[in-house]
From Swiss-Prot:
It comes from the Bacteria. The lineage of its organism: Bacteria, Bacillati, Bacillota, Bacilli, Lactobacillales. GO terms for biological process: tRNA methylation; tRNA wobble uridine modification. It comes from Streptococcus pyogenes serotype M6 (strain ATCC BAA-946 / MGAS10394). It is found in: Cytoplasm. This is tRNA uridine 5-carboxymethylaminomethyl modification enzyme MnmG. HAMAP family: MnmG_GidA (MF_00129). InterPro entries: FAD/NAD-bd_sf (IPR036188), GIDA_C_N (IPR049312), MnmG (IPR004416), MnmG-rel (IPR002218), MnmG-rel_CS (IPR020595), MnmG_C (IPR026904), MnmG_C_subdom (IPR047001), MnmG_C_subdom_sf (IPR044920). The gene is mnmG.
């Protein structure tokens, strides 16, 4: 079929949420002429649910996005109202940063960034179809009948795909926050042959700040110590005038109200059909699943400086409006609270992610990529991370360059994508530190060390950032080398000082790095014995030094495991492999292999239901029939 295109682009990104923004900025910055199409320009980078960025695992993803040259970290550093480091009492592998966002300012700043970006056109239009010829993307069709040519298309439609809002017995077609749903595109993705799933998520009510009795709640302030998501942000710019959050709880009265109205709850009445998130359940789901709990935490989170709206985190619900009001008024501090927006549930279509390659390109259609909630994930950060990788790979494909695949040992983003394409997901996927087997080397403090060079190689890290990275890396390397070369001797003067500090005296000579391995010895104490570095070190370098030195043994073991897995990842599986021709593989394994079509032995070994014997048989088969090569 011959198409008459009115405009032509290298890459078209459909949807301007957190995934779409990162995808379009990446492609345009890599030199591709890009169109970012959105149903509503006023909802670019909008936060339809929680007004925050980061948190456990997610905060590390934001730093990874930043290290690769993405925008989310920079944008939240310009627009937060509170910053807090989580899990400070735990090990370094699980520490992560979280920021309360001024949600309207966050969206405005991101829109400004997109509008001024070279090679990037921003357009309010609805895309109804993906145009495909001979198994390859050639463009898109708008709702008004316009056809735009493209060499690659990235679908980042969030919860808009056949979205339906549910509130009590009310159910109507809608995207998030009463925006338009994308129904025709959902129909046409299915017609293209993609397998479609149906998920559900929800959001809590918003209450008016001036109607809250804060005296009945517990204040939750931000941190005084400077922290940032972007490695380019300066401590001098750290916000002093932060806005606190507040903690309150449900109670028995709250639970009684919910239990008495479960028959009206869409989750239990049969109105909701989609699968909801395990790690962010609705309050009615929590009351039923955890009936023995006397109360549940609720955090009152301001949505910005210039609004009265307060997000009641932990109270996600689709109960009828009258029940929501009674529920709010049963909570300490909210007895007279004015509900400004009701909570609601939203159901939406997803592209089942086992149909994707690790580049986030669909296996079925060349040049078609998907990212974000479209792939079955939850969360702005997960979406942004996928959007960045999809955008990078769309640009690389257009330019005829080698693809970028982040491994599980490279980044949390790599863990997430591998989980999605290898295991799929039966519910909205959320990143957790427990999903990462190499989490000790995927920390928040070393994201730039892990990924900045990759960002530089693909063209997303500019000269200013690269210079700053080189300075930091050289300072780190030089100080580590110095600490590994200086010896502390067990002489009287040294041991007198050691004992004055309440520490165990030295019995043998010890290099400074070994001395720092003692749990009670931090960097400042160590250099008080051996003298300071040749130049002043930033607090972030000191944090990195302490972690790398104190956990060196564990880190080395993790790196040994990575090396073993790398050998598995290097063993490729031909794309044209005949799974039925492999004798002795278990039926379940054969079915999974056919469904997922793994690209490497490493990926095959991580598929649920595949055991080591199946992998051994597969490897023997490939060694005897290894002449075929995977083609993309």
């Amino acid at each position: 079929m011959t198409h008459e295109f009115t405009e032509s682009y290298d890459v078209i990104v459909i949807g301007a949420g957190h995934a779409g923004v990162e995808a379009s900025l990446a492609t345009s910055r890599m030199g591709c002429k890009t169109l970012l199409a959105t149903i509503n320009l006023d909802m670019l980078a909008f936060m339809p649910c929680n007004p925050s960025i980061g948190g456990s695992a997610k905060g590390i993803v934001v730093r990874e996005i930043d290290a690769l040259g993405g925008e989310m970290g920079k944008n939240i550093d310009k627009t937060y109202i509170q910053m807090k480091m989580l899990n400070t009492g735990k090990g370094p592998a699980v520490r992560a940063l979280r920021a309360q966002a001024d949600k309207s300012l966050y969206a405005r700043e991101m829109k400004h960034t997109v509008e001024k970006q070279a090679n990037l056109t921003l357009r309010q239009t609805m895309i109804d179809d993906i145009l495909v010829e001979d198994g390859r993307v050639v463009g898109v069709l708008t709702a008004t009948g316009q056809k735009f040519a493209a060499k690659a298309v990235v679908v980042t439609t969030g919860t808009a795909l056949r979205g339906e809002i549910i509130l009590g017995e009310l159910k109507y077609s809608s995207g998030p926050n009463n925006s338009l749903a994308s129904v025709t595109l959902a129909d046409n993705l299915k017609k293209l042959g993609l397998e479609i799933g149906r998920f559900k998520t929800g959001t809590p009510p918003r209450v008016k700040a001036s109607s809250i009795n804060y005296d009945q709640t517990e204040i939750q302030p931000g941190d005084d110590k400077p922290n940032h998501f972007s490695f380019m942000s300066k401590d001098a710019d750290y916000l002093k005038d932060q806005i606190p959050c507040w903690l309150t709880y449900t109670n028995q009265t709250s639970h009684d109200i919910i239990n008495q109205n479960l028959y009206r709850a869409p989750m239990f009445s049969g109105i909701v059909k989609g699968v909801g998130p395990r790690y962010c359940p609705s309050i009615e789901d929590k009351i039923v699943r955890f009936a023995d709990k006397e109360r549940h935490q609720l955090f009152l989170e301001p949505e910005g400086r210039d609004t009265e709206e307060v997000y009641v985190q932990g109270l996600s619900t689709s109960l009828p409006e009258d029940v929501q009001k009674d529920l709010i008024h049963s909570i300490k501090g909210l007895e007279k609270a004015e509900m400004m927006r009701t909570g609601y549930a939203i159901e939406y279509d997803i592209v089942l992610p086992h149909q994707l390659r690790a580049t986030l390109e669909t296996k079925l259609i060349s040049g078609l990529f998907t990212a974000g909630q479209t792939n079955g994930t939850s969360g702005y950060e997960e979406a942004a991370g996928q959007g960045l990788i999809a955008g990078i790979n769309a640009a690389l494909k257009v330019q005829g360059k080698s693809e970028l695949i982040l491994k599980r040992s490279d980044a949390y983003i790599g863990v997430m994508i591998d989980d999605l394409v290898t295991k799929g997901t039966l519910e909205p996927y959320r990143l957790l530190t427990s999903r990462a087997e190499y989490r000790l080397i995927l920390r928040h403090d070393n994201a730039d060390m892990r990924l900045t060079e990759i960002g530089r190689d693909i063209g997303l890290v500019d000269d200013e950032r690269w210079k700053a990275f080189e300075i930091k890396k050289n300072q780190f390397d030089n100080e580590l080398k110095r600490l590994n070369s200086i010896k502390l001797k067990p002489v009287k003067a040294t041991n007198d000082r050691v004992q004055e500090l309440g520490f165990k005296p030295l019995t043998d000579a010890m290099i400074a790095k070994e001395f720092m391995r003692r749990p009670e010895i931090d960097y400042a104490t160590a250099v008080s014995f051996v003298g300071p570095a040749a130049e002043d070190l930033d607090a972030k370098i000191i944090e990195l030094l302490e972690t790398e030195i104190k956990y060196e043994g564990y880190i080395r073991k993790a790196l040994d495991q990575v090396a073993k897995m790398k050998r598995m990842e290097e063993k490729r599986i031909p794309a044209n492999i005949d799974w039925d021709a492999i004798d002795s593989i278990a039926t379940e394994a054969r079915q999974k292999f056919k469904k997922i079509n793994p690209e490497t032995i490493g990926q095959a070994s991580r598929i649920s239901g595949v055991n080591p014997a199946d992998i051994s048989i597969l490897m023997i088969y490939l060694e005897g029939n290894g002449k075929a090569h995977r083609k993309y």
